[in-house]
């Protein structure tokens, strides 16, 4: 599934040797798998805390646990040890984690979701927010719901009109309008 270089194996095994925990393992996850915002994470874990979908991989000096739901995203990946100025750090090259941009003939919904994930949500994430597609009406109105720091934010109207709507209409000229159906009365997590 993925390859760990010999140097990286020695480095990880040494990290485990320094821990005072007998059953500790390395959990490899892909957060937001299949989206442009995907990221691979490495964390210490105890196997008993993992769901049954995690499979065990044995290496000299440690065990890695990977959710079988992430196997396709980690295919052809490589974990290596790289120089990081003051020392070394683990890096992963994972060409399949982010998924692929939809093809030209893909459904409009799929293409809009991709643009939201790839181009819009990374900007909103800097304020702890996100937007998601609710539906596309037969009249080509795009209905969205904001969440996180965008829900209840006093700037959401300008974010919608000048940011999200402008970007979606530029990418998809067939869109007639972009509407927000979020309940903005809840301001508990609002950015401003």
Curated annotation (Swiss-Prot):
Belongs to the NfuA family. One of its GO terms (molecular function) is iron ion binding. It comes from Ruthia magnifica subsp. Calyptogena magnifica. Binds 1 [4Fe-4S] cluster per subunit. The cluster is presumably bound at the interface of two monomers. Coiled coil: none annotated. Its cofactor is [4Fe-4S] cluster. This is Fe/S biogenesis protein NfuA. GO terms for biological process: iron-sulfur cluster assembly; protein maturation. Pfam families: NifU. Involved in iron-sulfur cluster biogenesis. Binds a 4Fe-4S cluster, can transfer this cluster to apoproteins, and thereby intervenes in the maturation of Fe/S proteins. Could also act as a scaffold/chaperone for damaged Fe/S proteins. Homodimer. Keywords: 4Fe-4S, Iron, Iron-sulfur, Metal-binding. [4Fe-4S] cluster binds at residues 150, 153.
